[in-house]
């Protein structure tokens, strides 16, 4: 079984690769992990992982730079139901649009938009609320 982590210029590839390899080894699974932008390797994989670090528009631009990648992803994930994991902005890109820095068209797989969290609670600014926020 092949797990492909797509390399489109995102910054956390090694961390994602190491996490998958550690989990595979710890559980004695028979999976191979590949980090690639090669469309044939992606097409022949069993699982696709799209990581993402950076801004929504920059990540979308990275996908567009690999000719045929967006079309292949749609075919494999949406049409052929290949298992897919989007991590961070890789997950956000499945939406219709993102509004970080500017309005950017996403993959359109999931209805909805990605918008900045407003750190308000009952119309009061929450002091020291960091964005992005984990948890």
Where are these regions (language model features)?
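Extreme N-terminal starter segment of soluble prokaryotic enzymes
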Residues: 1-4
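Amphipathic alpha-helical repeat scaffolds
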Residues: 7-15, 55
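Residues that form or flank phosphate/diphosphate-binding pockets in enzymes
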Residues: 14, 43, 102
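Short helix-loop-beta junction
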Residues: 19-30
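Short gly/ser/thr-rich secondary-structure transition/capping motifs
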Residues: 28-35, 65-68
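Short acidic low-complexity segments
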Residues: 32-44
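Cysteine-nucleophile active-site neighborhood
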Residues: 47, 53-133
